[in-house]
Regions:
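Conserved catalytic segment of ABC-fold P-loop ATPases
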Residues: 138-145
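Helical segment within the ABC ATPase nucleotide-binding domain
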Residues: 109-122
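Conserved H-loop
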Residues: 132-138
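ABC nucleotide-binding domain "signature motif"
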Residues: 6-14
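Conserved ABC ATPase "signature" region
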Residues: 17, 37, 49-66, 83-85
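A short, proline-enriched helix->beta-strand linker immediately N-terminal to the Walker B motif
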Residues: 86-97
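Conserved ABC ATPase "signature" C-loop
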Residues: 148-149
Length: 150
C-alpha cells in the first residue's frame, strides 16, 4: 500500500501492478537489466518469474541494445517504456496506470493500450487514469469522471 485512504476503506483481492510515476522503483545508477529485477521484486514478482518474463519485458520496452546501460542515461520515453513493460508483465489481477502514457510516443501508447486490452480480456482489472478521452473510450467499459475531486 502506498498511502492509507483518507476516508473509507478498500479491499484488494490479488496482486497489484502499478505504474504511478515514471521510473518509481528504479535506481538511476543501475542498468536496465538490474532495474528490471529490482522493480519486478518491488512489484512482488519472484526472481524466477522475472527471469521467465525478462526477454518479453525487454522486447516490449524496445531497449534491447541499451539493456546494460544505466537508466540515468535513458530518455524519458525509454524510462517509461521499461517501467510499463515491467508492470504489465507482472500479470497482476489489478493494474493501476496513472497518466504515465503521456510520456511515450504515439506508437508506444498504442502498444500499451493493446497490452492493457490483453490484461482486461484475461479478466483482470485495470484502473486507468487519463485525460485522453479516446484512449479511455477504447479501453474502458466503465468509467468515473472526477471534477475538482468529486
Amino acid at each position: 500500500r502506498i498511502t492509507e485512504p483518507t476516508s473509507g476503506r478498500g479491499e484488494l483481492f490479488g496482486r497489484v501492478g502499478s505504474l504511478l510515476e515514471v521510473g518509481s522503483g528504479f535506481h538511476p545508477e543501475l542498468s536496465g537489466r538490474e532495474n528490471i529485477f529490482l522493480n519486478g521484486s518491488i512489484l512482488g514478482m519472484s526472481h524466477r518469474e522475472i527471469a521467465r518474463n525478462f526477454d518479453e519485458i525487454v522486447a516490449f520496452a524496445e531497449i534491447e541494445q541499451f539493456i546494460d546501460t544505466p537508466v540515468k542515461r535513458y530518455s524519458s520515453g525509454m524510462y517509461v517504456r521499461l517501467a510499463f513493460a515491467v508492470a504489465a508483465h507482472l500479470e497482476p489481477e489489478i493494474l493501476l496506470v496513472d497518466e504515465v502514457l503521456a510520456v511515450g510516443d504515439a506508437a508506444f501508447q498504442k502498444k500499451c493500450l493493446g497490452k492493457m486490452n490483453e490484461v482486461s480480456k484475461a479478466g483482470r482489472t485495470i484502473l486507468f487514469v487519463s485525460h485522453n478521452t479516446a484512449a479511455l473510450l477504447g479501453l474502458c467499459n466503465r468509467g468515473l469522471l472526477l471534477e475538482r475531486g468529486n
